[in-house]
Swiss-Prot record:
It comes from Arabidopsis thaliana. This is HVA22-like protein a. Pfam families: TB2_DP1_HVA22. Belongs to the DP1 family. Disulfide bonds: none annotated. It is found in: Membrane. The keyword Electron transport does not apply. Keywords: Membrane, Stress response, Transmembrane, Transmembrane helix. The gene is HVA22A. Induction: By abscisic acid (ABA), cold, drought and salt stresses.
Length: 177
């Protein structure tokens, strides 16, 4: 009976990375992410969002260089240690890697890259930039100034609508501008 338990313990220790890897890299972060969504704190949201960004980058690198990585016998242990460092909030590993390595590349690419992409051509801009700009304008100029801009835009829209309607009356209903 003692040898059976010893053999079982040996198998567990030899395959520790295989057993602990998914728990550390997926199960616990998924649970913690759901808990973070349910709280009002933004600090834990940032922790888990940065973790998932780094997890996806690590997975992408691992899939890209799979043939090279299989030559490293300790890769699974290195990945487990790295993942533990990223996951455990006490170490703030995910925040550190994101702030020092990922953020400079994606948030301010012009400081890293030598090529130039104009702001209008940047396809990676956030869709809520308009909302952010509106909030900033309201904070600086007040809600009354914002209402004036909206009323001017509404008047302009109505004017343009009448312009299109005149084309419709001239050319028929099938006319498209």
């Amino acid at each position: 009976m003692g040898s059976g338990a010893g053999n079982f313990l040996k198998v567990l220790l030899r395959n520790f990375d295989v057993l602990a890897g998914p728990v550390v890299s997926l199960v616990y972060p998924l649970y913690a992410s759901v808990q973070a969504i349910e709280t009002q704190s933004h600090a834990d949201d940032k922790q888990w969002l940065t973790y998932w960004v780094l997890y996806s980058l690590l997975t992408l690198i691992e899939l890209t260089f799979a043939k090279l990585i299989e030559w490293l016998p300790i890769w699974s242990y290195m990945k487990l240690i790295l993942t533990c460092w990223l996951v455990i909030p006490y170490f703030s590993g995910a925040a550190y890697v994101y702030e020092h390595f990922v953020r400079p590349v994606f948030v301010n690419p012009r400081s890293i890259n030598i090529w130039y992409v104009p702001k209008k051509m940047d396809i990676f801009r956030k869709p809520d930039d308009v909302l952010t700009a509106a909030e900033k304008y309201i904070a600086e100029n007040g809600p009354d100034a914002f209402e004036k801009i909206l009323s001017r835009a509404d008047k302009s829209k109505r004017y343009n609508k009448h312009e299109y309607e005149s084309y419709e009356t001239m050319y028929g209903e099938g006319y498209q501008y």
